[in-house]
Amino acid sequence: MKFFTVLLFVSLAATSLALLPGSKDELQMKTQPTDAIPAAQSTPTSYTSEESTSSKDLSKEPSIFREELISKDNVVIESTKPENQEAQDGLRSGSSQLEETTRPTTSAATTSEENLTKSSQTVEEELGKIIEGFVTGAEDIISGASRITKS
C-alpha cells in the first residue's frame, strides 16, 4: 500500500513540474488589422435597462453586441524561443532545463516579473527535493520488497 502511495505522490509531483509556466515553449498570438474580414468576434458596446426594453419595441433598440471581424489569415503565432537556437542532441537533465527556462532575463520589464521568476525557481527547487525524497522512498520500498520471500 505504501508503494502505491509513493507512486501516486511521485506522479503528482512530476505532473506539477510539467505544468509549471515556462516549462515548454510559450506561444503568443498577435492580430493584425485588415480590410478582408471573414471571421466574427463579438464585443459589448451598449447596455439597455429592463424597463426601457419592456416599454419599447426591441427591434428599434440599439444592439447590445457589436461584431468586430478579424481575418483568420492575419493571426500570427510567434514563439518566445529564439529562432537561431540550435536543437540539442540527447537529453538534458530536468533540473538544468527548468533553471534555463526560468532564469531571470536582463530585459525583465518590472520587479513583479522578477519576483515571480524567483518564486517560481524556489518552488521548482522545493519540488525537486520532494521528488528526490519520493524516489528514494520508492527505491527503499522496492529493495525491501525484493527481500521478502513467500513461505
Swiss-Prot record:
The modification Phosphoserine is found at S54, S59, S63, S71. Residues 53-71 have a biased composition (Basic and acidic residues). It is found in: Cell membrane. One of its GO terms (biological process) is cell adhesion. Residues 29-123 are annotated as: Disordered. Residues 42-52, 103-114 have a biased composition (Low complexity). GO terms for molecular function: cell adhesion molecule binding; sulfate binding. InterPro entries: GLYCAM-1. Glycans are attached at N115. Belongs to the PP3/GlyCAM-1 family. This is Glycosylation-dependent cell adhesion molecule 1.
